[in-house]
Amino acid sequence: TRKESSAASDVYKRQRKTAAAGVQVPPDLLYAYFRLSGRSRVLKAGSYEIPRGSSPEYLLDMLAEGRQAVRSVTLVEGWTFRQFREALARADHLKQDTTGLSGPEIMTRLDHDGIAPEGRFFPDTYVYPKNSSDLGVLRQALQAMDRRLEAAWSVRAPDLPLQSPEQALILASIVEKETGLQADRGQIAGVFANRLRIGMPLQTDPTVIYGASEAQGVAFEGRLRRIHLDTDTPWNTYTRPGLPPTPIAMPGNAAPVSYTHLRAHETKAN
């Protein structure tokens, strides 16, 4: 059985919690032990889970090293920003500081004002201390995607028909939704790169689906029909040439090589 003890540097004032955790030392003596150890000033505040029967030495090491109770949340490749937010809302012991905020408002809080949130967060498993803010997890994912996008853009092919890292991210998201197979991504990206080069519409179903659903804040239901293909939206790559205005999903780690470092024979695909 584990009991939670918070505010590590205030153990003396939290005698009941320490005793409930099963540390078999009177609180006054425990406090004195911490002071005499010479490490009392390095104890780290936070949320801790203390195993019942812990020794003073174990407890001191735990608090000095900041081994807080942590939880994790997994954000999956190919998810949309809406799905990311739903996963964060379900996460254990994660404060919901973004409740009621729009996507643009969240990006402003994350110091990315004016940037669309779709596609900007790297899918991965994120570990966080209990009772952290969901904004903290989003910031981790945002910074992780920024780093990967910058690295991929720095080694892009010289003749790539893309003008900015943002366009590369948009193309990466389309490739992500087109296939889950890493081996196919280069060929698919090559097809799209060639179409962009000659001004041909990309004609890819995932963008149509996004424009008919996620762009409106809802999940897509049913099957893709002719009416969807014929209905013009900024994301309909059948009715409009070029890239859509935003990514359509969160591309994973394998995507950057596919959309920024195409081999010559791939860019000749049609």
Show which residues each predicted segment covers:
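Short, flexible, glycine/charge-rich loop motifs used to bind or transfer phosphoryl groups or to couple energy/partner
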Residues: T1, G38, P158
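Single conserved hydrophobic/aromatic residue that forms the stacking wall/gate
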Residues: T1-A8, Y12, H261-A264, K268-N270
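Acidic-residue sensor for enzyme active/binding pockets
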Residues: E4, E77, E176-E178, E266
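Signal peptide-directed extracytoplasmic domains
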Residues: S9-A152
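Bacterial extracytoplasmic/cell-wall-associated proteins, especially those involved in peptidoglycan
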Residues: E86, D92-K95, T108-R263
